[in-house]
UniProtKB/Swiss-Prot annotation:
This is Chromatin target of PRMT1 protein. It comes from the Eukaryota. There is a cross-link at K70 (Glycyl lysine isopeptide (Lys-Gly) (interchain with G-Cter in SUMO2)). The lineage of its organism: Eukaryota, Metazoa, Chordata, Craniata, Vertebrata. Asymmetrically methylated by PRMT1. Symmetrically methylated by PRMT5. The modification Phosphothreonine is found at T243. Residues 158-196 have a biased composition (Gly residues).
Length: 249
């Protein structure tokens, strides 16, 4: 009764091929040749490169992109301009007169002017006409006395008139200049120096200053020159504010 009630299953399109044979044939049909893969990849790359070239050409033709390409980033030297110290620091402090400081270094009034040496506030930044003859080393090292490392030449600072409105203050430079044949200058700070005339140093170590090598002097000069003009102006103004009350005593 159960066999009669169940309908007979009839499979159409039957085959005698086994599953192994069927899947083997399917794998053979689907597997492409390696040469075809390489050729298709090269074709795709060529198409992509052609599209990229067209896109790049369209981008270059845009006005905004053309303007940006003209403003390419400059090299470090081009952005900084001249690599020397004078170009980075600009003009020296104040207006230097003719032949103010002749030497290899940048002509600037160094730190630590002698007490009572130059007066007149900002007007003291104009040096005398004869100028100083140095070899590029720093004039003043930071104290209140003139302490040149290489020494000034004879008749270093010449001129009868003084810079600025106050002229030359106490202990100032005479006609013979610093350490010259005239009265010279009285260095009141630590380690002043004595010239051929009556100029003398009243501080400690006036004539016993150690001799430094050229490399050490150049290193000191480079360290000083690396400071900006604003920093030097601030130091000079602070020092002149300290020395003005003392000179007016």
């Amino acid at each position: 009764m159960a066999a009669q009630s169940a309908p007979k299953v009839v499979l159409k399109s039957t085959t005698k091929m086994s599953l192994n044979e069927r899947f083997t044939n399917m794998l053979k049909n689907k597997q492409p040749m390696p040469v075809n893969i390489r050729a298709s990849m090269q074709q795709q790359q060529q198409l992509a490169s052609a599209r990229n070239r067209r896109l790049a050409q369209q981008m270059e033709n845009r006005p905004s992109v053309q303007a940006a390409l003209k403003l390419k980033q400059k090299s470090l030297k081009q952005r900084l301009g001249k690599s020397n110290i004078q170009a980075r620091l600009g003009r020296p402090i104040g207006a230097l007169a003719r032949g103010a400081i002749g030497g290899r270094g940048l002509p600037i009034i160094q730190r630590g002017l002698p007490r009572g040496g130059l007066r007149g506030g900002r007007a003291t930044r104009t040096l005398l006409r004869g100028g100083m003859s140095l070899r590029g080393q720093n004039l003043l090292r930071g104290g209140r006395a003139v302490a040149p490392r290489m020494g000034l030449r004879r008749g270093g600072v010449r001129g009868r008139g003084g810079p600025g409105r106050g002229g030359l203050g106490r202990g100032a430079m005479g006609r013979g200049g610093i350490g010259g044949r005239g009265r010279g200058m009285i260095g009141r700070g630590r380690g002043g120096f004595g010239g051929r005339g009556r100029g003398r140093g009243r501080g400690r170590g006036a004539l016993t200053r150690p001799v430094l090598t050229k490399e050490q002097l150049d290193n000191q000069l480079d360290a000083y020159m690396s400071k900006t003009k604003g920093h030097l102006d601030a130091e000079l103004d602070a020092y002149m504010a300290q020395t003005d009350p003392e000179t007016n005593d």
